[in-house]
């Protein structure tokens, strides 16, 4: 299964760039992964339309109005998609003004990190860390020590 993590806009903060690179490296032990810096929400929709894969990617949006999952539930989500043959999970952190109705309608799942508002660059790192944590839970790695 391939993971693609997309976000709108460039990452300008060196510490965020460093954390992003570190978690992408860690994730690559468990799945092929790729980060995508997109210029706009429209670019994400075009990316979905142009997909040439046998099956389209499963689009998971991050949005404050989405479903809140525990780390264990994220692990179960990843496990479900691995065991059911999902070829690609495409996670997307939205633009500052939120996702449009069209993009929300195109999504297979909308997730949230809670009712708090995070800077978009920080939300990217939290997403990458939670995906990594999810895989370590599945593999019984000591990174996730419980609560």
Kindly give the residue locations of the regions a language model identified:
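Post-transcriptional modification and biogenesis factors for structured RNAs
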Residues: 1-147
């Amino acid at each position: 299964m391939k993971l693609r993590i997309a976000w709108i806009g460039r990452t300008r903060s060196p510490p965020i760039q460093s954390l992003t690179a570190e978690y992408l490296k860690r994730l690559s032990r468990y799945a092929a992964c790729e980060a995508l810096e997109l210029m706009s929400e429209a670019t994400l929709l075009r990316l979905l339309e142009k997909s040439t894969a046998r099956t389209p990617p499963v689009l998971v949006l991050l949005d404050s109005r989405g479903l809140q999952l525990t780390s264990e539930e994220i692990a179960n989500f990843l496990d479900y998609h691995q065991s059911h043959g999902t070829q690609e999970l495409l996670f997307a952190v939205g633009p500052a003004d939120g996702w449009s109705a069209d993009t929300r309608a195109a999504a297979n799942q909308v997730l949230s990190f809670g009712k708090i508002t995070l800077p978009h660059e920080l939300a990217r790192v939290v997403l990458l860390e939670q995906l990594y944590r999810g895989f370590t839970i599945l593999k019984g790695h000591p990174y996730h020590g419980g609560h």
